[in-house]
């Protein structure tokens, strides 16, 4: 039975990367998500149960507890909803230990580690033949870039990504579309498709 579920970790990490990109999340923020951290947005009912994501483990100032924020799903990233639905309803139940609340439980039942996510991203990046300068955080940078290009208000973007100062967000405003990051996105999609293929073979 264990071998028949070997595709699940690949599907999980690919979905994590898609979520990090679609909501502009830091590595620790996305890996720390629990099942209860999503809710409907009354102002955007078309997104169903994934209209709002509650980040409870945001980057903290030194000596302070983790910052919390709410991130709204925006139409440009609506595609992530089907990815999340598939993970939550179809795939996660196949692997989640009893009573686990983690959105992305590891094979041992605990939270997936930050190092595991970095290794997964590195593998995707290498498979795509991209520069080593790209890292997991590039997904978040790309989110900000797209939000700026799509004309969202600077303060809204700042609130979405949890930047303490507007100047931090403004660093991204001079960036142009990064083809390399988009290639990474395509590679992640291929990883998901490969994982789905695995479900059909078992």
Where are these regions (language model features)?
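C-terminal catalytic core of Y-nucleophile DNA break-rejoin enzymes
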Residues: 61-85, 99-122
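C-terminal secondary-structure termini that scaffold catalytic or DNA-interacting sites
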Residues: 187-202
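A short, glycine-centered helix-capping/turn motif at helix boundaries
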Residues: 19-33, 150-152, 163
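Basic, Lys/Arg- and aromatic-enriched nucleic-acid-binding interface segment
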Residues: 1-27
